[in-house]
Curated annotation (Swiss-Prot):
GO terms for molecular function: oxidoreductase activity, acting on paired donors, with incorporation or reduction of molecular oxygen. It catalyses: uridine(34) in tRNA + AH2 + O2 = 5-hydroxyuridine(34) in tRNA + A + H2O. Belongs to the TrhO family. CDD domains: RHOD_YceA. Signal peptide: none annotated. It comes from Burkholderia cenocepacia (strain HI2424). PROSITE patterns: RHODANESE_3 (PS50206). The gene is trhO. This is tRNA uridine(34) hydroxylase. The lineage of its organism: Bacteria, Pseudomonadati, Pseudomonadota, Betaproteobacteria, Burkholderiales. It holds the Pfam family Rhodanese. NCBIfam families: PRK05320.1.
Length: 284
């Protein structure tokens, strides 16, 4: 059976999450869906999977049911297919933020940060500057272990361990961004959108987010100006610029990414350990 995997997020002011939670949970269970939906005052973030019929019904429900008062009418979904269900259960959770930055919640009603689409970004990188002649700086907003799997050429990488560290490292490194066009990017768009909004709010000029993140960039223009693969938070571990799963795997014990080269190590035992396990244990 082919399973449809859906991912979506949307920054929008929400105030009825407690009332919605049991109703959304019930509808998802009726459809046989599994995955996680996060609801917060700043918006929605979801990863769910099910049959084609079930996912189509969910999209119609979340976009058009009167319960949501049109707040998700423009919600855009990223879709991928798998041969099996990647999630064990269905959860609808209430959160303070849909992606944790530990800063005052952003105000979606004030508008999103400007974005640049994949084709325009590629043209900028081809030329070495944007349309106004400013040098372009690619800013990776992901965690260090994700960056190690692949990133844009010459991207700024501040080696953060979690997204909540982002505001602090930006405050400490603002000089890197002065006089340049800054393009924040992440896997699918949510972190780079929130990062761009934060930078805009603290007065950094000429900030853009990469529309749809790395995965949308791969879909539109392939791997131009990018080296390596893109880490994803599911059973596939990483996708190449053709959006195909790679031979990278995730260590069952320490959750590190194990490359094909590392899989040749005697310390790699599938389902038990990998070369990174001792370092992970000492850091715990």
């Amino acid at each position: 059976m082919t399973i449809v995997n859906l991912a979506a997020y949307h920054f929008v002011s929400l105030d009825a999450n407690e009332q919605w939670r049991p109703l959304v949970t019930a509808r998802c269970n009726e459809l046989g869906l599994r995955g996680t939906i996060l609801l917060a005052p700043e918006g929605i973030n979801l990863f769910i999977a099910g049959t084609r019929e079930a996912t189509d019904a969910f999209i119609a429900y979340i976009r058009h049911d009167p319960l949501f008062e049109g707040k998700f009418a423009t919600l855009q979904f990223k879709e991928s297919l798998s041969d099996s269900q990647p999630f064990r259960r269905m959860l609808v959770r209430l959160k303070r933020e849909i992606i944790t930055m530990k800063k005052p919640a952003i105000k979606p009603e004030l508008g999103r940060a400007p974005f640049v689409d994949a084709r325009t970004l590629k043209a900028w990188l081809d030329r070495g500057h944007d349309d106004a002649g400013r040098p372009v700086v690619m800013l990776d907003t992901r965690n260090a272990f994700e960056v190690d799997v692949g990133t844009f050429d010459n991207a700024l990488d501040y080696r953060i361990d979690k997204f909540s560290e982002f505001p602090e490292v930006i405050d400490a490194n603002r000089a890197d961004l002065e006089g340049k066009t800054v393009v924040s990017f992440c896997t699918g768009g949510i972190r780079c959108e929130k990062a761009a909004i934060h930078m805009k709010e603290i007065g950094i000029d000429n900030v853009y987010q990469l529309e749809g993140g790395i995965l949308k960039y791969f879909e539109e223009v392939g791997g131009a100006h990018y080296h390596g693969d893109c880490f994803v938070f599911d059973y596939r571990t990483a996708l190449n610029p053709q959006l195909q799963p790679t031979e990278n795997v995730t260590c069952f014990a320490c959750r590190a990414v194990v490359t094909p080269e590392a899989q040749q190590s005697p310390s790699y035992v599938p389902g038990k350990s990998c070369p990174a396990c001792p370092q992970a244990a000492s850091a715990a």
